[in-house]
Structures are given as C-alpha cells and as structure tokens.
Design a protein with these regions (language model features):
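Conserved lysine of the Walker
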Residues: 52
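The conserved Walker
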Residues: 48
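Charged, well-structured alpha/beta interaction segments
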Residues: 96-126, 131-132
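Conserved substrate/cofactor phosphate-moiety recognition/catalytic segment
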Residues: 57-105, 109
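NTP-dependent small-molecule kinase module
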Residues: 32, 58, 62, 174-180
Length: 180
C-alpha cells in the first residue's frame, strides 16, 4: 500500500484528513451491466519509442469499432495536463504513475475499459498501480530493442540523452532492465 493512501478503499474514513468515503448507489457493477461490458485496465509499459502509444491506439480503435466504451491514457498527453506540474525525478515518476492509476480506477468504476501507454519503468510503481486499480489490472510489456527505439525516436530524446542534455532518461541514463 502506498504510504498514507488507502488503495483498496476498504476503510470508510481517513481521520488524519477528516475524510469519509461515500458509497454511491450506482456502482461499477451497475454501470458494467448497463454498458454490457466488463471494465478493466490494460497497462502498457516499455521504453520510449517501443510502440506503446501506437499499439494502444490501434487497440482502442478496434474495441471502439466493437461498440466498447474505452479511454486511452497516453504518457505525453497526461503529462501535458493532469501531471504538467511533475518532472522526471524518482519522486515525480512515482506520483505520475499513482495519479494515472487513480484516474484509470475512476474510469473503471465508471464502467470503461482503460488502455494506458506509459514508460512506467519501475516494478514497484506498477505494483502500486495494480493495487490501486485492483483485479481488472492487466500488464503488457512492449518489448522493443533499444536500437529500434532509437530509430523510431522522432522527438530526438535518445540523442539528447546520449549527449547529456536529458538526465534520468530510461534506457540511456537509467537502467532499462528496471522497465521489465
């Protein structure tokens, strides 16, 4: 469990912050029944340029064509909005993944199928995401060689990291084995 955070929502109050969890009459199960689908999250991780966003987008299009209610959460998009105040320090990466997991959980509770595409390099962060999201968490690692990722790098991030212009870049200045 993340420190100071109730990932299972089994406690009805948080006396430290004077909070009470309110149970709603229309719950996840009722929403799933109405939408005729089971809500879950597909959590895609892998290096920058591995193809996470491309695969996630193709999957969402396929599910949408089948009449499924979906939402795609992409790393760059979320960092430009909800997580625009976060950098790439270890602490900020943990918070980035925690917030994304919380959003995915809320969307699952709304009956949606959620597809995420984030580097999410640390196993402990993905485990925390799994705790927050619960049983509907499905992890997919998009395995692509560092060489192929560099070839696909339209943003020039790998080059900049190799030149020392980007600190803490997964796969270059951070251990890429931690992603698996």
């Amino acid at each position: 469990m993340t420190e100071g955070f109730n990932t299972q929502r089994d406690e009805k109050t948080d006396s430290r912050h004077n909070l009470t969890w309110h149970m709603m009459d229309i719950n996840r199960q009722k929403r799933e029944k109405q939408m005729q689908q089971k809500a879950f999250t597909i959590w895609m991780s892998g290096l920058s340029g591995a193809g996470k966003s491309t695969i996630a987008n193709a999957l969402e299009k396929r599910l949408y064509a089948m009449g499924k209610k979906t939402m795609l959460l992409d790393g760059d998009n979320v960092r430009m909005g909800l997580n625009s105040n976060l950098g790439f320090s270890d602490e900020d990466r943990v918070e980035n993944i925690r917030r994304i997991a919380e959003v995915a959980k809320l969307m699952n509770d709304a009956g949606l199928i959620v597809i995420t595409a984030f580097i999410s390099p640390y196993r402990h962060d993905r485990e925390n995401a799994k705790q927050i999201i619960g049983d509907g968490f499905r992890e997919v690692y998009v395995s692509t060689s560092i060489e192929e990722c560099e070839k696909r790098d339209v943003k020039g991030l790998y080059k900049a990291a190799r030149e020392g212009k980007i600190a803490q870049f997964t796969g270059i200045t951070r251990d890429r084995k931690s992603v698996v």
